[in-house]
Amino acid sequence: MRKSRKSTGRWLNEGDAVIIFRNTGQVINHARILDRKFRIETPDLGTIAVDTDSIMSIVFKNLPTYPTDVLRTLGGTELNGTILNDLIRVKAQDLGGTVEIRKAKIISIIW
């Protein structure tokens, strides 16, 4: 008998993420983001802290396509502004364990 699976709204399973680097296009698969929350400063709502478990993707400022950072939640909300987490803690076997990556080096994180 086949088990039914409920969609989580995420592309990857088990909390894994894909990190795409800005200048090189390098991709890290099966990364675990260790930050529990991401804080984003928005022009309309002020500073908001969003649980990492509720985030579907983050695209960091990339002119001209993305004039601000964009955080998308599993609920469909899109927040535009500045992500305040400068260092992002990541655990990935391919990186040799736990590392900190500056947000300026990352173009996007997709869960």
What are these language model-derived features?
Residues 1-111:
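Compositionally biased alpha-helical segments
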